[in-house]
Amino acid sequence: MSFDLIIKNGTVILENEARVVDIAVKGGKIAAIGQDLGDAKEVMDASGLVVSPGMVDAHTHISEPGRSHWEGYETGTRAAAKGGITTMIEMPLNQLPATVDRASIELKFDAAKGKLTIDAAQLGGLVSYNIDRLHELDEVGVVGFKCFVATCGDRGIDNDFRDVNDWQFFKGAQKLGELGQPVLVHCENALICDALGEEAKSEGRVTAHDYVASRPVFTEVEAIRRVLYLAKVAGCRLHICHISSPEGVEEVTRARQEGQDVTCESCPHYFVLDTDQFEEIGTLAKCSPPIRDLENQKGMWEKLFNGEIDCLVSDHSPCPPEMKAGNIMEAWGGIAGLQNCMDVMFDEAVQKRGMSLPMFGKLMATNAADIFGLQQKGRIAPGKDADFVFIQPNSSYVLTNDDLEYRHKVSPYVGRTIGARITKTILRGDVIYDIEQGFPVAPKGQFILKHQQ
């Protein structure tokens, strides 16, 4: 049998092992894994490289339509490809209108035409004003629904995203349980965080340490406990977004041990940055939940290695530079991290701390694909989409602004020495990024809809 592509001599991350083996691709799918696979139109030599499943980033904000001056499909998905991401799950907020019904998601599909370098699945929004329309998004094919129990959205814009109160969350979770859809939650206590923030600003406490103190760990833990119980009563599968504290992870672990259907994610910035670094970097490292102290970070690494965190995500949430101006308490909260999830975490988790390659593959790709039902993604296995990233270990570089593909070339990682490099990203058998050639093909990304897999 002749194949379209054979990748030879790489250390391939399989589900339960990593070994030097060849991969054959035909028609955009993985056709065979083994040795002496035969002939192919193209042969790639991956000697000395790690071949990982392409990252499935389950938490990405692309602000198009409506706020394309923040980030757009063209720049955002190119950055993703350069960073080894082959599939993103896009959040329903930051764009205008927010993705809360059939009409708004169709606008998003139109805005992305011809611009997707990678594949993209969609989340719908659960907001205060759309509980009677959740079924529309399910029918279109979203893979989950995101909501906030922390304050969010611009109250001066009618079609912006909105947080939910406990009653709205409960009613929405009941409906999503009936639809068989998971609810994803940003967990911070809205009233307490808002009050602590206002108190700090009124007293002139506007440093990074002050911001972190205004969103203490207990506000995350309380919100996690609350939504765990409400989702359990409502009969809805739950996913906790961007957990920032080991205490928060412990709540999820406890609920799982009691039989609840719950998963969780965290982000690289909670493992590689701390509050002192946040103070040095400034507003580019502001996010919520916030980047906490070094002791908290050590606890997060322990939870990650224990297998208590299901997946790692970027929570890429950029904005125009002027929204990052001024003091930390007033600046927009969101980190541009899409391009540096894979290389930073390979360096920090695998090279510096000894994480196994199969565990790395699960955290970056496999588990997210499983959680959100992306049946063709997340694994190097026969029959799956031929999505790969080539990683060059022990190859250090210093990240510069010019390296970034974002609309706004800023990131809290600029200036960081990263000890691994993404050298090639392959989507459904085609090279979409190469460290020497850049982006050699026209955008070929597709939207992944739940009911069309």
Swiss-Prot record:
Subunit and interaction comment: Homotetramer.
This protein's record includes keyword Metal-binding: yes
Function per UniProt: Catalyzes the conversion of allantoin (5-ureidohydantoin) to allantoic acid by hydrolytic cleavage of the five-member hydantoin ring.
Gene3D superfamilies: Metal-dependent hydrolases, Urease, subunit C, domain 1
Catalytic activity, reaction form: (S)-allantoin + H2O = allantoate + H(+)
Modified residue annotations for N6-carboxylysine: K146
Organism lineage string: Bacteria, Pseudomonadati, Pseudomonadota, Gammaproteobacteria, Enterobacterales
Entry protein name: Allantoinase
Natural source organism: Escherichia coli (strain ATCC 8739 / DSM 1576 / NBRC 3972 / NCIMB 8545 / WDCM 00012 / Crooks)
Residue positions binding Zn(2+) 1: H59, H61, K146, D315
